[in-house]
Amino acid sequence: MRVTLSGDARGSVYYTLDGSMPTPSNTKKYTGAFYVPGGTVIRAVSVVKWNGIRSDETSMTVTARGNLFADVKPGDWFYNDVDRIAAEGILNGTAKNVFSPNVGLTRAMLATALYRAAGQPEVSGELEFSDASAVGSWCRDALLWACENGIMRGYEDGALRPGRSISRAELGCMMTRYLVLSGKDISELEDVLSGFSDAGAVNESMRTELNAACALGIVKGVGGGRLDPNGGATRAQTAVMISRMLDKL
């Protein structure tokens, strides 16, 4: 991947490619664009010599698939899956060079990711929910597709709540619905959900679909025998689960 660096025009930028701290005395001075292989961690600092001002260090990882993130590094448990899902344009970063792996996501964001994974098929019609007028144009087609295909459902009061945060249980259920839409048979999967100590916290209407996601290895526990079904799903968890789901197709 071709990399360019920038800093204070009055000074110089120094960088390393081995993960060590860059300093003016023993590391490379940036003179122009350079190429690095995937998996390289670039650490850079800008130094203005005449007054000794030194910028905060910047650290970026060039992933194996050519993504450039400051908060996704080799060794992170989600590294390969985030790299894959971002490279395929399914779940993009939240800002330039930022993925925000520990941030949650909304129902609209998840619908958009799954819609992209499906190839963004053409849709027609209107969202028939009490809060449909509040749906932004950026996610309208994705939500329409998700609702028409039974992947996302509204609430008993007639609202869709696209801005509501996704729980781990909801995420697992939607992964299962996506697989069923793609032709996956989930009728004879073993019961693994009951093996989690907090399985009783799962809404009865979600148990079959969430169990399928667990039995297929899409949703896994968080440690200590717990599933944390009602905990908020993070962007990293979502990328990992989508990647696992796609492997089942």
Please place each PLM-identified region on the residue numbering.
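C-terminal/domain-terminus segments
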Residues: 234-241
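Extracellular/luminal Pro/Thr/Ser-rich low-complexity repeat and linker "mucin-like" segments
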Residues: 1-10, 77-88
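Feature responds to low-complexity, polar/acidic, surface-exposed segments characteristic
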Residues: 61-79, 87, 92-111, 115-141, ...
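Charged, amphipathic alpha-helical interaction segments
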Residues: 45-51, 151, 218, 243
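Short, small-residue-rich loop/turn micro-motifs
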Residues: 9, 17-19, 114, 118, ...
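Short, compositionally stereotyped local motifs that mark structural "simplifiers"
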Residues: 1-66
